[in-house]
């Protein structure tokens, strides 16, 4: 009986559980979106909130009208990516985590609550193996 | 008249055009999914096919049952992320590009055609500013 239940509901031990929360963040204070250190700090904190293990984090600044900041954190074995465009007061955020106990939505909401976009969207994609 | 049309259909010069193609790739030859150099080479070629400008590419190998390879390319100003789990013959792929002329779908399909998953999904998310 338990074996039958097990085959109907595969154990999370037997597959990769991938959770990807992503969205677009509109109308943000442009000064925040130029502050590479602040943005990297938010992503670092988000890694903890999502219950992920950080492997490496890196950030870059880009000049020009369509410039801004990119922060990418590699975690085991997925990523957080935050891209900003200060002239457009715009940012996009992807929080992709692995593991049944990870919480990408909490990490996404943490960054949103700090950047305070006037509008934003949040979507979920299942990145699990079969 | 042209001004009116312009306000109805905003010029792509006036906003960030972000295109994100992503999906899960099932049942891949596990030897391919352990070959960090091969996977990094595929992502580098995909950057060109998508008509993106590479800023930096990096790859990592992870051991253990849930290990594999991660390759992340930062491009101006978005990313390609390929994560693999060889024990599960599984990979996920995100090709997120900026610019009206970029072609993330061609890059996605290039990597799929090389990894030859028995099944895969492909989704599109609009990451453009308003």
Curated annotation (Swiss-Prot), chains A, B:
Write the Enzyme Commission number(s) for this entry: 4.1.1.19
User: SUPFAM superfamilies attached here?
Assistant: S-adenosylmethionine decarboxylase
- Give the metabolic or biological pathway: Amine and polyamine biosynthesis; agmatine biosynthesis; agmatine from L-arginine: step 1/1
Tell me its cofactors. Answer: pyruvate
Q: Which UniProt keywords apply?
A: Autocatalytic cleavage, Decarboxylase, Lyase, Polyamine biosynthesis, Pyruvate, Schiff base, Zymogen
Q: Give the note describing cofactor binding and stoichiometry.
A: Binds 1 pyruvoyl group covalently per subunit.
Alphabetical GO CC annotations of the entry are:
cytosol
Site residues by UniProt (Cleavage (non-hydrolytic)): 77-78
GO annotation, biological process: arginine catabolic process; polyamine biosynthetic process
Task: Give one Pfam family.
Answer: AdoMet_dc
The record's account of how the chain is modified after translation = Is synthesized initially as an inactive proenzyme. Formation of the active enzyme involves a self-maturation process in which the active site pyruvoyl group is generated from an internal serine residue via an autocatalytic post-translational modification. Two non-identical subunits are generated from the proenzyme in this reaction, and the pyruvate is formed at the N-terminus of the alpha chain, which is derived from the carboxyl end of the proenzyme.
Record InterPro entries: AdoMetDC_fam_prok, ArgDC, S-AdoMet_deCO2ase_core, S-AdoMet_deCOase_pro-enz
One GO term in the molecular function aspect is:
arginine decarboxylase activity
Query: Per the record, what are the reactions this protein catalyses?
Result: L-arginine + H(+) = agmatine + CO2
Q: Where is the active site?
A: 78 (schiff-base intermediate with substrate), 83 (proton acceptor), 98 (proton donor)
Modified-residue entries (Pyruvic acid (Ser)), positions: 78
HAMAP family on file: AdoMetDC_1 (MF_00464), ArgDC (MF_01298)
Q: Which PANTHER family match?
A: S-ADENOSYLMETHIONINE DECARBOXYLASE PROENZYME
- Functional description taken from the UniProt entry: Specifically catalyzes the decarboxylation of L-arginine to agmatine. Has no S-adenosylmethionine decarboxylase (AdoMetDC) activity.
Per the record, the similarity remark reads: Belongs to the prokaryotic AdoMetDC family. Type 1 subfamily.
Quaternary data: Heterooctamer of four alpha and four beta chains arranged as a tetramer of alpha/beta heterodimers.
Protein name from the UniProt record: Arginine decarboxylase proenzyme
Q: Which organism is it from?
A: Sulfolobus acidocaldarius (strain ATCC 33909 / DSM 639 / JCM 8929 / NBRC 15157 / NCIMB 11770)
């Amino acid at each position: 009986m338990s074996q039958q239940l097990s085959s109907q509901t595969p154990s999370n031990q037997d597959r990769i559980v991938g959770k990807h929360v992503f969205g677009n963040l509109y109308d943000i204070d442009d000064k925040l979106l130029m502050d590479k250190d602040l943005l990297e700090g938010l992503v670092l904190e988000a890694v903890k909130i999502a219950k992920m293990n950080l492997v490496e984090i890196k950030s870059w600044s880009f000049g020009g009208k369509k410039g801004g900041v990119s922060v990418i954190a590699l975690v085991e074995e997925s990523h957080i990516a935050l891209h900003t465009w200060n002239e457009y007061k715009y940012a996009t955020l992807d929080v992709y985590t692995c593991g049944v106990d990870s919480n990408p939505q909490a990490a996404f909401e943490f960054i949103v609550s700090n950047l305070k976009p006037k509008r934003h969207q949040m979507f979920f994609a299942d990145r699990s193996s079969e």
